[in-house]
A protein has these predicted regions:
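A generic, well-ordered mixed alpha/beta core segment in the N-terminal half of proteins
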Residues: 138-146
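Structural motif
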Residues: 16-18, 146, 220
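Helical "lid/coupling" subdomains associated with nucleotide-phosphate turnover
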Residues: 4-7, 21, 43-70, 74, ...
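N-terminal basic/disordered segments at the start of proteins
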Residues: 2-31
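N-terminal glycine-rich anion-binding loops that anchor highly charged ligand groups
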Residues: 28-42
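Short acidic/polar active-site loop segments enriched in Thr and Asp
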Residues: 15, 78, 293
Length: 313
């Protein structure tokens, strides 16, 4: 069978839905042709018992998927994959959403297990030429529903787990009023959730001393965009290394602000302003758990891993 040369991926995350069209080639084996995202929080309600996708969330998600498929169409990909992560995986009505998406798009929606998600994120990371110098390192991918944690030794995955520490999930669980300033109590509750999850997960920080940590997902992308706006440069011109001190300073800055004021911060998407405090707190809890002073940021995560799978690279 002839290997495909152009593929497309729609990554249905908890806080946004992203599309990637890619072809074989480039330094990491994958050359992106289109990279587009739509803020569409399908995960509202996943903090409930049991977690459920709301009707509004499913409708908004379906509209975003149709919009991205329209953007993909001119590239005529030979294979197109739709994948869903924590919000759909954990929702009691996740399979109903998958059936709805297949009915309106004609594409089957693949609901990834936590292990599949973590491993595909790892596969995507290794396609990033900017990380080619890393041999043994950790990867943390924070979404709206979950936190994927990986450890690479000699560029091979040694550990991969999924923890229920997504920023939408923790905001619903730990922040009584997301429109109000982020209180010390909420910060402590998010930290406690993270410590408990790491403590019971069996994830080991056992790589050689000095092994780096990569952070992916919208949280650090947002931090870099805020830095870019304040520096008068584009996001790619900012450093991909984000210090823990910078994360802590940004959290201290936004924690005292009510939601309307947070939404005025240049570079901070309005749709993420309510969950960013919990997201930054989670990143700081990861740094504490692993004794990291900084993270390297990469945009090559899940959708790049799925593209690598489709392209067979």
């Amino acid at each position: 069978m002839t290997q495909p040369t152009v593929v497309a991926v729609v990554d249905i995350g908890s806080n946004s839905i992203k599309a990637l069209v890619a072809e074989r080639g480039g330094p990491g084996g994958i050359a992106p042709l289109l990279n587009e995202a739509v803020d569409s929080r399908i995960s509202a309600g996943i903090g409930g018992t049991p977690p459920r996708l709301t009707e509004d969330g499913m409708e908004c998600g379906a509209a975003a998927i149709r919009k991205l498929l329209d953007a993909i169409a001119p590239f005529a990909p030979e294979k197109t994959a739709l994948v869903a992560t924590s919000a759909v995986r954990d929702a009691a009505n996740g399979t109903e959403f998958a059936r709805r998406i297949q009915a309106v798009t004609g594409h089957e929606l693949r609901i990834l297990s936590g292990g599949e998600e973590a491993n595909l994120i790892g596969r995507g990371l290794t396609s990033d030429p900017r990380l080619a110098d890393l041999q043994s390192f950790y990867v943390f991918d924070l979404g709206g529903g979950s936190l994927e944690c990986l450890a690479f030794r000699s560029r091979r995955i040694e550990q991969a787990i999924s923890l229920p520490l997504g920023c939408v999930r923790l905001t619903e669980r730990c922040v009584p009023d997301p429109a109000a300033p982020f209180t010390d109590r909420s910060r402590a509750d998010v930290y406690a959730c993270c410590r408990a999850a790491f403590g019971s997960s069996g994830f080991r920080f056992s790589l050689p001393a000095g092994s780096g940590a990569v952070f992916t997902g919208g949280t650090v992308t947002t931090v870099r965009q805020i830095v870019a706006e304040r520096s008068g440069v584009s996001l790619p011109e900012t450093s991909p290394v984000i210090s823990v001190a910078r994360l802590r300073a940004l959290l201290d800055e936004i924690a005292v602000l009510p939601l309307p004021s947070r939404r005025q911060i240049a570079g901070l998407p309005a749709a993420r302003a309510d969950v960013l405090p919990a997201a930054l707190t989670t990143a700081l809890a990861v740094a504490e758990a692993g004794a990291f002073s900084s993270f390297r940021h990469s945009l090559h995560n899940l959708r790049f891993g799925v593209a690598a799978e489709l392209l067979e690279v």
